[in-house]
């Protein structure tokens, strides 16, 4: 089930966090990524559509600061999850994505996308984060995080995954479509007799938000994919 799958995912993130991330920070150079709040996948209820980002931003004034010395107790994990739920309601990133599915896509079944970040490491400047995650001296951290997300999707196999930006799109293709050199905006991932349609966007939100034409085109692509899956 969705709940069981995200519990396993969150446990894997918790277990690798201290040893692997600490080692990654020690081995990489020229990076401003720091050991601070990371991000669990909070239970959002089941939905046929998921919305993938690269990594979560760091709140200006987070309620809980996680350091290398923090003890990840169940109480602290609960506080982190609660803060994330509040962010889903309050942050423009999530509001704009929900508005897009409501106003532009306009399909009742797709009004509540499930948000998931490929890398649950809080850092606001994505160009800095991309340099960090692609650093060849990173060690096993990226591979472990890639596997955690892939195992999660293999278990859930949602109907549609919309990838929010170009950076995340490139990395998702490496994880799920290794060896495929494709500039296609849609690819179908197959596993265990099920199919997930992945739709790659250049930039749905953030500073370089999609222009009106690109939003319309992405919304149309999502509708066409949904209707094709449901023989409409």
Model-derived features with residue positions:
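Low-complexity, serine/threonine/proline-enriched polar segments
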Residues: 72-120
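A short acidic (Asp/Glu
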Residues: 61-64, 125-128, 165, 170-176, ...
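Charged, often glycine-rich, active-site loop that binds/positions anionic groups
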Residues: 114-143
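C-terminal capping/extension of enzyme domains
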Residues: 1-16, 135-147, 169-232
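Short, solvent-exposed loop/turn segments at secondary-structure junctions
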Residues: 55-59, 119-123, 166-170, 203-207
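Beta-strand-turn-beta hairpins that frame and shape the catalytic cleft
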Residues: 47-49, 105-113, 189-199
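Proline-aspartate-enriched helix->loop->beta-strand connector
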Residues: 149-166
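Active-site and ligand/interface coordination hotspots across diverse enzymes
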Residues: 1-89, 148-152, 189-191, 228-232
